């Protein structure tokens, strides 16, 4: 006869893997960008804003946490959790900077960190035909993920995201 702990472990294994975005889910890209650009990111000249960001030493590594985002990390790291974040082709420092941020602020193993082009995110939607979960603030990523057979959580607020995870069986 199985005990409760064994049953909990089996059900934990049956849960999907979780893939979590970084920018505007875990770290505050827009706040960091506004600090170096001097105005809101969407309003700034496209080329000029990226020149300022790429010219700022450790821009990515020093981004602040989004309010409440540590709760998301605490919750998901009890399961098969991954980081799935797009790097910027407009800033050659974005990949290494994001890795620095993650190593400084989280305990994700290198094998569970996936820094990809945005269009590649949806290729992680399933593993061996089993759907994975994506937590992302960008609705286009969620729709592409779901179209590839994954389960999307459109992140707009920490309590909403945690409730969605709970609804899916993540306690």
Predicted regions: what is each one?
Residues 1-16, 25-27, 65-71, 75, ...:
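Charge-dense, intrinsically disordered terminal/linker segments
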Residues 130-167:
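Acidic, Mg2+-coordinating phosphoryl-transfer loop and its flanking beta/alpha structural elements
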Residues 17, 113-142:
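Conserved Lys-Pro-Asp/Glu-containing loop-to-beta segment of HAD-superfamily phosphomonoesterases
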Residues 44-45, 54-83, 91-96:
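Short, acidic loop-to-helix structural element flanking the phosphoryl-transfer center
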């Amino acid at each position: 006869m199985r005990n409760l702990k064994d049953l909990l472990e089996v059900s934990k294994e049956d849960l999907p893997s979780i893939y979590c975005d970084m920018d505007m889910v875990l770290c505050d890209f827009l706040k960091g960008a506004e600090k170096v650009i001097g105005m809101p990111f969407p309003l700034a000249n496209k080329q000029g804003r990226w020149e300022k960001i790429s010219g700022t030493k450790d821009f990515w590594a020093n981004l602040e946490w989004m309010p409440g985002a540590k709760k998301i990390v605490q919750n998901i790291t009890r399961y098969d959790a991954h980081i799935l974040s797009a790097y910027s082709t407009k800033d050659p420092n974005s990949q290494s900077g994001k890795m620095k941020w993650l190593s400084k602020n989280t305990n994700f193993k290198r094998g569970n960190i996936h820094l990809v082009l945005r269009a590649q995110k949806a290729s992680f939607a399933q593993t061996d035909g089993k759907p994975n979960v994506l937590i992302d603030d960008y609705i286009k990523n969620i729709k592409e993920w779901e179209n590839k057979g994954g389960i999307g959580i459109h992140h707009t607020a920490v309590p909403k995201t945690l409730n969605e995870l709970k609804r899916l069986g993540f306690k």
